[in-house]
Amino acid sequence: MILQNFVVLEGGDGTGTSTQLQILQKRLSGEGGVPTYLRQGAKGGDLNTAWHIPGEGAFPQQARLPTTHFTFEPTDGPIGRLIRQALHRSPALHPTTIAHLFAADRHEHLYGESGIAERCQRGELVICDRYVPSSLVYQGLSCGDDTPAFLNSRFPYPELILFFELDPEIAEQRYRKRDTQDMFEHLAFQKRVHEAYERILPAYCAHGTTLVRIDASLSIEEVAEQVWRALQNLPIFKG
């Protein structure tokens, strides 16, 4: 089943999905915000986003800006917080346990009170940083394809997936600037992630999801424009 009005941002680590979600949140607020970017050197070039709010007509306003909810997975709910702790704990939880936790977090995210499904069905746009494809890729690489495929088989397909494409070596360079250490860090793993995405995404197209590939090697501004153009093709913007 396709869940209309549901948009998902997907890509390997370091491809910029979280940054673009923040940009969309400001742009769809209806304030006419135009992003400017400040690079802070304290942590080796971490990117922080600042916003300049100019006067009327700074960029073309849409005839209709839909009510939009921005979210991410794992969520900041109880199960999502447990996942974040588990990914950084020692000893690590069994990979199959992690896969079950992601599926439980996603079920609540979709069907809990004021969840994704409820919002989409009442005509709101929901934009989510990561969804089922991330589980099929990451948990598939850690515990095999069968378990995450089964756990996520009943969840709806999004109307649109924006896949952020980036050479794994460039993505790894970006990711290392965060100065973090976790199980998803190494370049060889990132190459496997990229290959796994290429393997699973065609199935979404076969089920009716629109897939738009975003060139994440471009500047943040150029990537943001690609994302914005893709969103404008959704029926909810033309209603």
Locate predicted features.
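The start of beta-strands in P-loop NTPase/AAA+ ATPase cores
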Residues: 5, 124-125, 160
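NTP-dependent small-molecule kinase module
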Residues: 1-2, 22-27, 31, 37, ...
